[in-house]
Amino acid sequence: MASTKEIRSKIKSVQNTRKITKAMEMVAASKMRRAQERMRNARPYAEKIREIVANLSKANPEFRPAYMEAREVKKVGTILVTTDKGLCGGLNTNVLRFITNQVRDLQEKNIEIVYTAIGSKGLQFLNRSKAKLISQTIQIGDTPHMDVLIGAIIAQLEAFERGEIDAVYLAYNRFVNAMKQEPVLEKLLPLEPAALVPEDKAGNSWDYIYEPDAESILNGLLKRYVEAMIYQAVTENMASEQSARMVSMKAASDNAKNVIGELQLEYNKTRQAAITKELSEIVGGAAAV
């Protein structure tokens, strides 16, 4: 049985660990609220671009932009969004499982995959898997900026424009609520015209005055729309990261509290046994006298 001194040392160690996890839980909760706000602020921009692109496409059906051109799929690109840091439960594992399943399904069809990694954890996974990378960006911080992401994103978009890849997918964790995040694998390119039109506005039809012309504006907006979708995915993944970390740290704090309780009980039993032994020795000594 451990001595009372050893048990006190263990209790002190677990208490210090609990202070750390409790502080990390509070920091993650604060960061999660800010990440949720950024996520909500990014949505109206993407929605408005989608609405304008849908109206332009309906008003000018003769245009067939490169981003909406479907072709036989022989090679695909996947943009993988993960976190830069750990301690967020199974968040990264869940989205990486999607990637593993995608690789298996596409390899069965002899389709090649090239990747863009956003986040250190995804980059490490792809390097271990010896996957083909065409671009990457890591250490994007708690506040994502498009100027940091754009270089990696453009590599995939330009590869699609040149016909080097035939489809682009986006893998990330969608934020549902503080307790739930779900991994998703979405098809980004080619864009489906029907997917651009919100159901509540499917019957509306608008047209605009174009300068210089409708085709160049449509091409430019489609590119901005795809970039906005990727930025939205990054903000959702960040909100998911902070909420998962908050939950993980809360679980760690609760477990530490339980361990402290068990150690305290063991300490009391050990101390009581020592006192009982001393009393027995005293009583035995007195009887001998």
From Swiss-Prot:
GO cellular component: plasma membrane; proton-transporting ATP synthase complex
Membrane disposition: Peripheral membrane protein
GO molecular function: ATP binding; proton-transporting ATP synthase activity, rotational mechanism
Entries under SUPFAM superfamilies matching the protein: ATP synthase (F1-ATPase), gamma subunit
Assembly notes: F-type ATPases have 2 components, CF(1) - the catalytic core - and CF(0) - the membrane proton channel. CF(1) has five subunits: alpha(3), beta(3), gamma(1), delta(1), epsilon(1). CF(0) has three main subunits: a, b and c.
Record NCBIfam families: ATPsyn_F1gamma, PRK05621.1-1
PANTHER family: ATP SYNTHASE GAMMA CHAIN (PTHR11693), ATP SYNTHASE SUBUNIT GAMMA, MITOCHONDRIAL (PTHR11693:SF22)
UniProt name for this protein: ATP synthase gamma chain
Source lineage: Bacteria, Pseudomonadati, Pseudomonadota, Betaproteobacteria, Burkholderiales
